[in-house]
Structures are given as C-alpha cells and as structure tokens.
Amino acid sequence: MAAQVISNSGHDEMIHDAGLDYYGRRLATCSSDKTIKIFEIEGETHRLIETLKGHEGAVWCVAWAHPKFGTILASSSYDGKVLIWREQHQNATSPVAGGAWTKVFDFSLHTASVNMVSWAPHESGCLLACASSDGHVSVLEFRDNSWTHQIFHAHGMGVNSISWAPAAAPGSLISSNPGPGQQRRFVTGGSDNLLKIWDYNPETKTYNNTQTLEGHSDWVRDVAWSPSVLSKSYIASASQDKTVRIWTSDASNPGQWTSQQLEFDTVLWRVSWSPSGNILAVSGGDNKVSLWKENLKGQWEKVKDIEE
C-alpha cells in the first residue's frame, strides 16, 4: 500500500480531518487554525489551490457532496456553524480547470460545537446531517435552489458523530420481493454512551428515533454505517471505553441488532468502512490503524496493522 505524505500542508495548527472528493482529484483539510485548504492531487504531486476562511473556531470536519450536485464542500466547527462552499466553474466544458470558491450557505442555529457533518447517499437527495455538542442533530436539504433545515434533540450530553445508512434497504437488491425504494435513515453516537437510529417519516416529514443501541460504557466517539446492501446491515461504533462494537442486523429481522465487541489498549477515535463495506478500519489514541474483516463464522478478525 503506497502512502503519499503531504508534509507542507500550509496549516498553522493541528489538522482534524481530511477528505478526498469522489474522483480522488481534490483533497480538503481542516485545522484548528480556522481554515480549510483544498489541494489538487495528480499522481504523486499535490498543489494547494485554495484556502477557505469563514469559521471563527477550530474546524473539525469537512465532507464533499456527490458531484451530481456540483463541486460542494461542507465544513463544521467549534464555532457552532456549518458552512457550505461551492466552486463556481469559469469554464463549464472543463471543470478540472478549477474556479472560484464561494460560501453559499451559513447555518448557525446550533448553540455549541458542530462535531461532524455527513452527506446522505446521493439517491436520497442533497441532504447533510450535522451532529452538535448542544445535543441536537440538524438535517439540511438543498432543493429548488434553496436550503431548508430541520433540527431536533438527539442525545442529552451532546452528539459526537453521525452516519447515513445506504439508500437501498439491506436485501432489497437480492430479494424477489423488494420493499419500498429509497430509505432515509442514519445513526448517531453520543456522549450518553448510546447509539440511536433515526428514520424519516415522509408523512410527518420528521426524523424519528426508532432504535437505541446500548453497550458502550463511555462516550461514543464515532459511528459508521456500512455501505453494503447485501443480506445484512452493519454499524461500527468507536468509543472512549477502548472498544469497537460491530452491530449487525439481518434483513429478515431488521429491528433486531446484535453486537460483537473488539477490545483495544487505547481510546478509539474513528471507524471507517471500505467502499464495498466488508473491511473496517479502526484508529485510536496510539496513532495506529487496524483493518478488520468478518470470517465465515461471523467473527471479526484483524487482517492488518498499518503503522507509519
């Protein structure tokens, strides 16, 4: 596995997040220095093309929207704001040429740090979910050239992380009798040690807490819903309690979740699935990344340690 290191990031303080766009040609980074930097990646080389300024505190998270909505980046910060940035292409026939970045939306209804932002699967629409230390989740939607929002209480002691389920329900691709089409659901992780699953009700136009998953004994730092849409749903959660839990639900009994616990020697910060949804990457306080995979018996095994 080749690693490319960007040593001259240009940030003045700690970098908190980095994300590649859909095509792997742009990298966005964000930092305690209150800025976001956009790099163009070509092979082994990279070039800083833009520095975005607008936040008044450390920027925790950056997330690229699907390119069908344009070149759009969301960011969230300690300042309680979610900002949406868009690149305006000068030359419509050659988007690679790049254009000017502008802030197109400033969402500032949260009363504390916004810790994470996550775009929904593009099939569901241009939807951004935001997790805040004020205990609330907001969902922003861009439709008919304007932004609307919903905001609701989720976890009493603050929301640390949020992750959308795939748009297709598990088993729907291989079922002879598929259920309804696009689902809008996500999972949140909180400082109350809980995971909560939220489902959108199109009749009431609200997100409702349909399931609460208990098992961690300390803050849930990160949650990640696997993109796999085969016969099972998987959610991974990383906690301050030095464990990762992998929660599994079978398509034949979608309301029933079981969990398997993976134990570590350090607090855990992030969990991330491979694009196919069968390999889980875990990172924690020891600056190591480990990769995990389910064996034929349904047990999760470590397949690799990645150390710099």
From Swiss-Prot:
Origin species: Aspergillus niger (strain ATCC MYA-4892 / CBS 513.88 / FGSC A1513)
Annotated membrane topology: Peripheral membrane protein
Keyword Calcium carried by entry: no
Swiss-Prot/TrEMBL GO biological process terms: COPII-coated vesicle budding; ERAD pathway; mRNA transport; nuclear pore localization; positive regulation of DNA-templated transcription; positive regulation of ER to Golgi vesicle-mediated transport; positive regulation of protein exit from endoplasmic reticulum; positive regulation of TORC1 signaling
UniProt keyword annotations, A-Z: Cytoplasmic vesicle, Endoplasmic reticulum, ER-Golgi transport, Membrane, mRNA transport, Nuclear pore complex, Nucleus, Protein transport, Repeat, Translocation, Transport, WD repeat
Name of protein: Protein transport protein sec13
GO terms of molecular function: structural molecule activity
A Gene Ontology cellular-component term: nuclear pore outer ring
Gene name for this UniProt entry: sec13
Keyword NAD found: no
Family, similarity comment: Belongs to the WD repeat SEC13 family.
Ranges of the WD repeats in the UniProt entry: 10-49, 54-95, 109-150, 154-208, 215-257, 263-302
Location relative to the cell: Cytoplasmic vesicle, COPII-coated vesicle membrane; Endoplasmic reticulum membrane; Nucleus, Nuclear pore complex
Principal location listed in the UniProt entry: membrane
Job of this protein: Component of the coat protein complex II (COPII) which promotes the formation of transport vesicles from the endoplasmic reticulum (ER). The coat has two main functions, the physical deformation of the endoplasmic reticulum membrane into vesicles and the selection of cargo molecules. It also functions as a component of the nuclear pore complex (NPC). NPC components, collectively referred to as nucleoporins (NUPs), can play the role of both NPC structural components and of docking or interaction partners for transiently associated nuclear transport factors.
Subunit-level organization: The COPII coat is composed of at least 5 proteins: the sec23/24 complex, the sec13/31 complex, and the protein sar1. Component of the nuclear pore complex (NPC). NPC constitutes the exclusive means of nucleocytoplasmic transport. NPCs allow the passive diffusion of ions and small molecules and the active, nuclear transport receptor-mediated bidirectional transport of macromolecules such as proteins, RNAs, ribonucleoparticles (RNPs), and ribosomal subunits across the nuclear envelope. Due to its 8-fold rotational symmetry, all subunits are present with 8 copies or multiples thereof.
